[in-house]
């Protein structure tokens, strides 16, 4: 790694500098000519600059990508550094490449890519799909493999997004299809290609401890709190953005209760499992993404969250072991249960909600604005839109599976320096760890134990820690 990682980071960052220098420029709202643009567009105040509408949402989304996803993956007892820092690395590189790729497809004008605050949000969305895929292979790949995967996945994401939004003309405000379905099935396919048959027999480091689960819960709470911003960040100003935040809020709240209920039901002693609370409580935000700005209604959002809490929790209990034991698909973070299945549900909910849209509910102008029934799409009806939404879900699924297969085969090449089975899920391979005087800690623990009453019984977790 001493040679591979520095070379990849230096060369790719130099490439980003060159490409940004050639192609990337500020858009009208970030350019010094903003005052002239204001006059041309009859804009009377600087407060109407898109920055003031989008930046609060951008802040929330940015925190989700770097803090939320990063800390959510710190549950592994010996891979905390890698979880947070490698997520940081892939996201920092990914947003640069995403600005270029998405810019070439969406904001390329007169030979230049014009970027503003919405470009930053969309780049974060793109990187979000990579963070999701990273969860499936967490602890089993090298940093160089992570960078290579990011390069290819961002490219495929941009192509898939362009097909859905520009060719099929679908709505996907919160990215149930473009972000979650694509990212999850891409990551799962890569994990399947990179399967390690002897991993369970040769490595016992995959697992959590009390403190690592607590750190992971920090990521959960950041994601849960900011998900309404995630799903509404790029919606139209006004009622659509407002509605997206409300629908997400309701779905997330319902999801928590059903997750807790099912977690207790499936446990033989009726106890709760932290892996369910860390992950399944977020499934409602995933599933409401596509239909977030549609007239899903508050009670409809509660129903979506209710269903996803059940599906995701049962997935962690039954699907994950099945995938690992029968299909040789080892999913470290359980993204199949948090992103893949809820993403499919979200795509279906979006298709049905779009197909059921009427002028009586949206008004004639509202219906045209919601689904952009204008220009080449002026003759499209809600039922047709529902069909295209379903087609978009299939395209995202296909891109994830086929793209994941190709990229997985590339990552399987020995030139990337992947870790051995024995070194998986262990920070020591890639990080200088702080030295600890184990004898001093054990001595202090033993001294504490000798002063306890003879009939004192230590809690189970403490006994395990002392052992």
Swiss-Prot record:
GO terms for cellular component: apical plasma membrane. It is found in: Apical cell membrane. Keywords: Ammonia transport, Cell membrane, Glycoprotein, Membrane, Transmembrane, Transmembrane helix, Transport. Glycans are attached at residue 42. Gene3D superfamilies: Ammonium transporter AmtB like domains. Residues 25-55, 102-119, 169-173, 235-245, 293-295, 359-390 are extracellular. It comes from the Eukaryota. The keyword Cytoplasm does not apply. One of its GO terms (molecular function) is ammonium channel activity. Homotrimer. This is Ammonium transporter Rh type C. It comes from Xenopus tropicalis. The lineage of its organism: Eukaryota, Metazoa, Chordata, Craniata, Vertebrata. The gene is rhcg.
